[in-house]
Amino acid sequence: MSVPQPRLTLSDQPSQVRHVVIISEDGMRPDLIYGQQNMVWHEQLYRNGSFSWKARTIRTASTLPSHASMLSGVDVDQHGLTWNTWLKTRGFIRVPTIFQAAEENGLKTAAFVGKPKLRHIMPAGTVGIFARPGYYCKKVSDEAARYIEREKPELLFVHFSDPDEAGHSDGWMTASYRKAALASDACLGTIYRALQQANMIDETLVIVSADHGGHARGHTGAIPSDREIPWIASGPGVRRGYHIRSAVSTMDTAATALAALGLAPLTRISGRPVSEIFQSSTRTGL
């Protein structure tokens, strides 16, 4: 059994946060977000929130290991997911995730994903709902939006596959990749509108990030464009239009989500809350 750890603290953590939504855009490069027109929902979030274009994923810059680190707060040597495909015989993540911490505190959790291999991170019994409505983000976001409006979860993870699929098919930063990024932007809007419709937006910390970037038709992790990822946070108490100064790791996503909800990790983690995103006026003493 995991030994509960002390609560991670955000010195400026806002008491208004009641929900956290993490949206991962598979293979999304940060320079695509700030360097392309019509990324309207991304722009709305980073102009009204805090952001880093130099956040980093783990050295194993691929979907399954990276998402495991994003949602557990530890590196691959601890979580054990070294492969990158659905292999039921290999088993599941060997450390607790943020969903288990939330579930143990009576919070409602859910995950809507485009790739079945992410089940290795969230086996049955560790997350309230695990759903794969389809591969592309339109089906994923539509189903997640309906769930948001109906259930109002405290912790939600949504995964979009579109940028990664286009990158592998035609190349990162190609016309088709840019088109896929625009589709992902529209799906981000679907989630945001659902939060508004459910009257959750004023109590929700939204974190938008990615598992890895890419170049040519792959992402080995050997160069910056593979490991650099966007990291955007928007919500109550978050600094507006603020460029994060400190280094941000994908493992910090887990830590920030837990701290924002006032939860302790179920085991020791490497990630740390990105506390500078919060305004000093919302200090709660955590």
Where do the protein language model's features map onto the residues?
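Short, structured active-site-proximal loop/turn typified by the sulfatase FGly-forming signature C/S-X-P-X-R
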Residues: D31-S66
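Substrate-binding rim/cap in mid-to-C-terminal beta-strand-loop elements of soluble/periplasmic
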Residues: L71, A222-A264, S275
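Polar, surface-exposed loop/tail segments
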Residues: L263-L286
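Structural recognition of the beta-strand scaffold that forms the well-ordered cores
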Residues: V20-S24, D31, S52-K54, S69-L71, ...
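Metal-dependent active-site segment of extracytoplasmic phospho-/sulfohydrolases and closely related
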Residues: V21-I22, W41, A183-P224, W231, ...
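Active-site His/acidic residue clusters
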Residues: P116-V127, A145-A186, T190
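Solvent-exposed loop/turn segments at secondary-structure junctions
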Residues: D26-P30, F51-S52, I58-S62, D75-D77, ...
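Catalytic-site neighborhoods of secreted/periplasmic enzymes
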Residues: D77-V140
